[in-house]
């Protein structure tokens, strides 16, 4: 099992090219099941979760071809299996997103209950309730969701009890091939949801209101393949910007999307960073200054993203002052705190709030990644810690960051992948 070995690196400097968004690519790849002709997707990151998604589609009988560094072509001509097995689904929670497309196009789907990061329960009930409102018969038996529909799904007026990105995406895809109009209220507004909707529209779907809390979908008879480019990864972008802020450096993120990161950029400015942006780039300059502590509360988009919470824990650990970070999206999402404490960070947990007292420096240590974003925070901490930091279990990192050690090296970071 690989590890990352990290040495104190000084101020990061230079340009880093941002990859396609994992959280947009995964539902877009699943949407390929809806297309009757070849579906070509570009700017697809080379990640463990993307590879799992491609393997899942192949398991169903789809032909999946990867070309170049970022292109995937999906053909469903020979798709003849409708079961997403446990061995694949257990490693990736986003596998649940195959449920809506299979059910909408083929009328049947058996999907193992999902795995992925160990961040709270994250139940799938919102996905199932919405599909049942659209006429699906659903049972959960022996760890599998078994869904059937006679004929086509029917449009429905769905009010979601809580905001769920995954459920919004599943219902968007299912409703695109349903009879009649579907209205989703209290829908997720995340940019990745909008990216999926734009992709479905390019395939022939009729969708209005994506990016607002009320989305209307008029079902169509069929969807066709198209050429679609996945949006930039806003969380990868934010992670590199925080790393630059913590190391008091100056970097430019290219092929980025500033509009999708407004809440994060505002907090970085509060921390003392100079931020400049263009249409597809973001530059951060700390001018050698120590960051200031910033209070954070994670909320659904367009608020501060939960996927950036761990990285800001590191920023506040080294900042001037005391800050609180409150997590309102997922329970059990402070598993990085004990690991950062091993490196000398001064942090206290009170329920869903972390109180962080900034200190001058961290110390290198052997630490363990517990989930995807926590692992990124440990890498950032290692860049500024005195001595050597070893991050174990980096398979979490490989689920969401493409060539992270190479990108940090390009900015002057001393990061090396080593075998156990």
Curated annotation (Swiss-Prot):
Its EC number is 2.5.1.7. It is found in: Cytoplasm. It is an enzyme of class 2 (transferase). It catalyses: phosphoenolpyruvate + UDP-N-acetyl-alpha-D-glucosamine = UDP-N-acetyl-3-O-(1-carboxyvinyl)-alpha-D-glucosamine + phosphate. InterPro entries: Enolpyruvate_Tfrase_dom, Enolpyruvate_Tfrase_sf, MurA_subfamily, RNA3'P_cycl/enolpyr_Trfase_a/b, UDP_GlcNAc_COvinyl_MurA. GO terms for biological process: cell division; cell wall organization; peptidoglycan biosynthetic process; regulation of cell shape; UDP-N-acetylgalactosamine biosynthetic process. Keywords: Cell cycle, Cell division, Cell shape, Cell wall biogenesis/degradation, Cytoplasm, Peptidoglycan synthesis, Pyruvate, Transferase. GO terms for cellular component: cytoplasm. Phosphoenolpyruvate binds at residues 22-23. Pfam families: EPSP_synthase. UDP-N-acetyl-alpha-D-glucosamine binds at residues 93, 307, 329. Coiled coil: none annotated. Pathway: Cell wall biogenesis; peptidoglycan biosynthesis. One of its GO terms (molecular function) is UDP-N-acetylglucosamine 1-carboxyvinyltransferase activity. The active site is at 117 (proton donor). The modification 2-(S-cysteinyl)pyruvic acid O-phosphothioketal is found at residue 117. It comes from the Bacteria. Belongs to the EPSP synthase family. MurA subfamily. Cell wall formation. Adds enolpyruvyl to UDP-N-acetylglucosamine. This is UDP-N-acetylglucosamine 1-carboxyvinyltransferase.
